[in-house]
Structures are given as C-alpha cells and as structure tokens.
C-alpha cells in the first residue's frame, strides 16, 4: 500500500496530476483512499500512520515510539522511512542527496495527494541555485520602515479593544501576512488581497503529507492562484525571469503559517508557565530566547519531508534513489535535549538566556526555510515582544483549539487570551 509517503510523483508543474486536468471527482476519491490508507496503517500499529491521522491529540507518544525503535523506522504500509534521531536528522539536512524533489523534479506523493504541493515546488526546483530567481526579494533601503515586524505588531494590537478577549490566531496570521507582504514588496493598496490569499494557503504544508477535505483542497488551490496574481502585480515582478512569481509565492506560503503557529505556540508555552511569562514582561528582550525554546520544544514544522535524489547511505542503511524519508523535528529536538544532560528538561526561557542549550532542528537549515527562516523567527519574536509589552497581564481566556488534519504544523484554529486581569 503506497500513500502520500510513497515515492511516486510527477514533474513539478507538470500536467499529469488530477489538479492540472481539473478532474476534481477523481482527485476527491484519491484523497479519500489516501486517508483510508493512513488510518489502516494506524490500525495496524504503525505509529507514523497514527501521526498522519492528525486529530487534536498530542502526537508526542507516537513520535517517541518511532524514536525508541531506532535511528530509522520503516513504515512499510506507507512506504516511508521515518526518524526521530537528532543525529540522523542533522545528517539528512546536511546531505545534498536528500531534497524535497527527486533528481528529475518529481514530488513524492503527488499521485496520492492531488491538489497539493504545487505552491511550494518552486522553492525547491533548483536546490543548488539562488533561493529566488533573479535574487528577489532583496530589500531596498527605502523599504526599511515598511519591513518592520515590531511596527506591524504594535499597529495590530492597537486595534484591540482594552479588556476584550483576543483570539491570537487571526492576530498572528495578520502579522505574518503584513510582514511577509512587506518583505516581498507588496504595495499597501494590495495588502488586503495578499492577506486574504495568503491566509487561504494555510493548509499547504500539511497537505504535503495529509489529505485534506476536498472542499479545503479546492479552496487552497483558488487561494494559491489569487496569491500568484497579487505577487505578479508587484513592482518586484517586473522584468523578472519566468518562475520568479511562483518562487516568491512558495516562500510566502512556506513562511506565513509557520510564523503564526510559532507565535501561538510560544504564547501557549509561556501561559502554562506564569513565572516565565512574568520574566518576559519584565524584560521583553527575552523574546528571542522564548522563541528559540519554542522552536526546540513546540516547533511550528514537526514533519520535514525528503526524498533521496540518489542512492544514499543513512544510519547504516542503503536507501535507493526515490526513497521517501520524514524527519520528526520535535522528536529530534527532544533527542538532542536528552543528550544535553539533566539541566535541559523542559521549556525554560531563563536557562536559554543565561546558559543556552541545544539548538532547534529546522528553520534556516530546512529546505522550506533557507531564505524565509530568519523572517519566521524575527516576526514571531516581534509579535511576542509586542504582546509582553502591551499586555503584561495576559492570561488564557478559554481552551486552545487545534486544527485537524494538521500533522506537519499542528496548527491552531483558536487561541483566546484576555489582555487584562479584571480588578
């Protein structure tokens, strides 16, 4: 049984996938079959299948089961090798034999997961080349003021009424869209369209490994096309070589929802540790340490998908070209913490600020984030710093709601907080 984790694929941007043929009925059936295959694998005791089921429960127990089975776990039913080992994760990241696309430009799982992935392919089509064709975007000096996540965060929070319950998910998404739009040179008058389209692409990373509902997949395709249209109207798009707009779209999509998830995860971790939140409000400069700890303990991208571009040896196993591999980033980070000694036992902003600790796996080193990783971190830090400065009495105002079918991001649908403690 071969699902999204399997090695089959078609050339990125090709015309053989159901999405290109607009055969939505066939695509919907294929998504249902892939979903059924992942559920069947879970029923047979496959922990990777349980992770891909992606309900609202914490996937950490299944991640740990995979890690405990050795450096490489073979999900036979899903045709994928999976690792929770930090050593193996770092080896995969450093080895050019592994990429997001095969050597001939095929994306693994395109047959099993139609209507997904095309908005991200352009970021990976030339692993050895520049992140974006023509060097876009290189920020000109006169854009310094617009490309300022601290200012964008402050402006958004100024619109929040005093004492009102604030849902951090739309705040984080709007902050991500504004900062990403400025980074890509989207004119102010087009930012509302850009924000709407970018938010509509929020399931793109999850859809690489987990079949989405057909209605959501179709909505995502429409949003991706709307985003391409907006970016094609920017001054930076003029005179750029073919593919530049698609590459810019890929980097926007790969950055935006991870920014929102990272910021929301950081707030959740701190709300669960009031003393650490108080330390942050006393010294907002700790926002960087808090984001690093969040990247370590609650990363915004938990599953990193790779395919062997050529025959490779990993953890003593020979993996033929076309082999699909998934890195469990959160498990790999916990593995690094175990090896760091007894001092690193959990989320601790003050320890990070004073003594450091293991560096999180992913982001700048990950294929999705070689260009956008610094933007993801910088924007999340700005949002967290602004919240600490503006709302030092921030507290939970209801349960957080996790999104289903979100094994990659473990995204949030709602995160209500109260800015002020009632007198």
Curated annotation (Swiss-Prot):
Does this entry carry the keyword Secreted? no
Ranges of compositional bias, category Low complexity:
1-21
What InterPro entries does the entry give? Answer: Cyt_P450_B (IPR002397), Cyt_P450_sf (IPR036396), P450-rel_GT_act (IPR030958)
Q: In which pathway does it act?
A: Antibiotic biosynthesis; tylosin biosynthesis
- Region Disordered: list its residue ranges: 1-26, 117-149
Q: What keywords appear on the UniProt entry?
A: Antibiotic biosynthesis
User: Superkingdom of this entry's organism?
Assistant: Bacteria
Which GO MF terms are attached to this record?
Answer: cholest-4-en-3-one 26-monooxygenase activity; steroid hydroxylase activity
Residue stretches of biased makeup (Basic and acidic residues): 139-149
Any GO BP annotation: cholesterol catabolic process
UniProt record similarity statement: Belongs to the cytochrome P450 family.
The record describes the protein's role as:
Involved in the biosynthesis of the macrolide antibiotic tylosin derived from the polyketide lactone tylactone. TylM3 is required for the glycosylation of the 5-hydroxyl group of tylactone to yield 5-O-mycaminosytylactone.
Name of this protein: Protein TylM3
Q: Which gene encodes it?
A: tylMIII
């Amino acid at each position: 049984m071969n699902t999204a984790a399997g090695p089959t694929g078609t050339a990125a941007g090709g015309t053989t996938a159901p999405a290109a043929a607009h055969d939505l009925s066939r695509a919907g059936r294929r998504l249902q079959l892939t979903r059924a295959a992942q559920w069947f694998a879970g029923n047979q005791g496959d922990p990777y299948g349980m992770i891909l089921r992606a309900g609202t429960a914490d996937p950490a127990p299944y991640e740990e089961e995979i890690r405990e089975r050795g450096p490489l776990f073979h999900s036979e039913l899903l045709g994928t090798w999976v690792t929770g080992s930090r050593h193996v994760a770092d080896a995969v990241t450093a080895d050019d034999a592994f990429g997001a696309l095969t050597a001939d430009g095929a994306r693994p799982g395109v047959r099993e997961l139609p209507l997904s992935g095309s908005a991200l392919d352009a970021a990976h089509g030339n692993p050895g080349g520049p992140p974006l064709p023509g060097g876009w975007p290189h920020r000109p000096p006169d854009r310094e003021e617009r490309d300022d996540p601290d200012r964008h965060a402050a402006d958004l929070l100024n619109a929040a009424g005093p004492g009102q319950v604030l849902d951090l998910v739309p705040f984080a998404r709007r902050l991500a869209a504004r900062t990403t739009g400025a980074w890509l040179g989207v004119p102010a008058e087009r930012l509302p369209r850009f924000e709407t389209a970018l938010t509509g692409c929020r399931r793109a990373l999850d859809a690489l490994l987990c079949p989405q509902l057909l209605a959501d997949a179709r909505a995502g395709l429409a949003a991706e096309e709307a985003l391409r249209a907006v970016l094609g109207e920017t001054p930076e798009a003029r005179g750029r070589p073919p593919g530049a707009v698609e590459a810019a779209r890929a980097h926007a999509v790969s950055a935006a929802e991870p920014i929102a998830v990272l910021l929301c995860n950081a707030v959740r971790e701190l709300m669960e540790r009031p003393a650490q939140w108080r330390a942050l409000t006393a010294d907002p400069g700790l926002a960087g340490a808090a984001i690093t700890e969040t990247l370590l303990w609650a990363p915004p991208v938990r599953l990193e998908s790779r395919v062997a571009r050529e025959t490779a040896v990993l953890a003593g196993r020979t993996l033929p070209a076309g082999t699909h591999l998934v890195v469990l980033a959160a498990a790999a980070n916990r593995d690094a913490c175990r090896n760091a000694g007894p001092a690193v036992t959990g989320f601790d902003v003050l320890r990070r600020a004073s003594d450091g600790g293991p560096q999180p796996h992913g982001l700048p080193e990950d294929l999705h984030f070689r260009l956008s990783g610094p933007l993801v971190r910088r924007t999340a830090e700005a949002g967290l710093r602004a919240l600490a400065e503006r709302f030092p009495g921030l507290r939970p105002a209801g349960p957080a709601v996790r999104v289903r079918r979100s094994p990659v991001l473990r995204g949030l649908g709602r995160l209500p907080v109260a800015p002020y403690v009632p007198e």
